[in-house]
C-alpha cells in the first residue's frame, strides 16, 4: 500500500511512502518515493503481477491548491525492491482545451479523478479519469473541498491511499461529501471521460476524450460510467437523459 502525507491543511500530498511486507516476515518495509517540487492529489497504486511491478500514480500541480498540470507516476520493482522509473507528464494546452468543461483550459483537469488504471503486457498502461463534482445551493465545490478525493465512490478506491475500507460506506454521504448529515440538496455532476495511454518508459502515446454530460440530485447512482475491457478495445457504458428518461449509451 502507499502512505501519503501533505501540507498542514491536508489538501495536497508532498510525501509518499510505499509500504510492503513479504510473506512470512513480521515487519513491513517502508520506502520513500521521490516527490520533488510538485504537489500530488488523488494518488493510487496498481499491482502489475505479470511484470512484478507496483505502479503509483497521481494527478499533480506545481502549487499548493493550484491547477492540475499533469500526471505523476513511479514504477517500483517488486523483486529488486527499487525504483525503476519516476517521472511526470505535463498536459499540453491542446489536451487541456479538449478536456475543459465548465472550467477554462488552465483549470481543465481540476475536476478529473482517476477511475481506472489498465496495465498492458508490454509494461505500458492506460489511465481513465472522469470529470466529477458537486454543488449545493449554487455553490460549486472544487477538488480541494472534498476531504479525501473524488466526491463519488469508485471501485478504484480499493487501490487508493484514502481507501473507504473501515465502515465508511459506498456512497458519498458516508465519506467524502462535506454536506454529510445535513439537509442541503446536493447536485452531482459526471462529465467527460479522459483516456490516456503511456508506454513502458512513461511516455504519453495518445489520448482520447469521451463526451458526456450527466447530473442528478442527492444521488450519484445513475450517473458515471462502467467500462468493459475487451482486450483490443475499451467499451464505455453510461446513462444519458432524454425526455426525463435514462437511456443507456
Question: What are these regions, as identified by a protein language model?
Answer:
Residues 1, 56, 127-128, 195, ...:
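Hydrophobic strand positions within the blades of repeat-based beta-sheet folds
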Residues 204-249:
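Extended, charge-rich low-complexity regions and/or helical-solenoid scaffolds
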Amino acid at each position: 500500500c502507499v502512505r501519503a502525507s501533505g501540507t498542514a491543511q491536508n489538501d495536497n500530498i508532498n510525501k509518499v511512502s510505499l509500504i510492503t511486507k513479504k510473506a512470512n516476515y513480521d515487519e513491513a518495509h517502508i520506502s520513500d518515493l521521490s516527490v520533488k517540487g510538485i504537489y500530488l492529489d488523488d494518488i493510487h497504486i496498481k499491482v502489475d503481477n505479470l511484470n512484478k511491478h507496483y505502479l503509483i500514480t497521481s494527478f499533480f500541480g506545481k502549487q499548493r491548491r493550484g491547477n492540475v498540470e499533469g500526471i505523476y507516476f513511479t514504477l517500483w520493482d517488486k523483486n529488486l525492491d527499487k525504483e525503476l522509473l519516476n517521472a511526470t507528464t505535463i498536459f499540453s494546452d491542446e489536451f487541456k482545451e479538449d478536456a475543459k468543461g465548465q472550467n477554462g483550459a488552465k483549470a481543465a483537469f481540476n475536476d478529473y479523478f482517476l477511475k481506472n488504471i489498465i496495465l498492458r503486457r508490454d509494461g505500458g498502461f492506460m489511465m481513465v479519469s472522469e470529470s466529477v463534482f458537486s454543488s449545493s445551493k449554487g455553490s460549486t465545490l472544487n477538488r480541494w473541498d472534498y476531504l479525501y478525493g473524488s466526491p463519488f465512490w469508485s471501485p478504484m478506491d480499493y487501490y487508493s491511499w484514502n481507501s473507504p475500507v473501515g465502515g465508511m460506506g459506498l456512497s458519498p454521504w458516508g465519506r467524502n461529501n462535506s454536506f454529510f448529515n445535513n439537509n442541503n440538496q446536493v447536485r452531482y455532476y459526471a462529465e467527460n471521460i479522459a483516456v490516456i495511454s503511456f508506454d513502458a518508459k512513461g511516455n504519453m502515446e495518445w489520448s482520447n476524450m469521451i463526451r458526456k454530460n450527466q447530473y442528478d440530485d442527492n444521488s450519484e447512482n445513475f450517473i458515471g460510467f462502467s467500462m468493459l475491457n475487451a482486450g483490443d478495445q475499451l467499451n464505455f457504458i453510461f446513462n444519458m437523459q432524454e425526455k426525463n428518461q435514462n437511456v443507456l449509451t
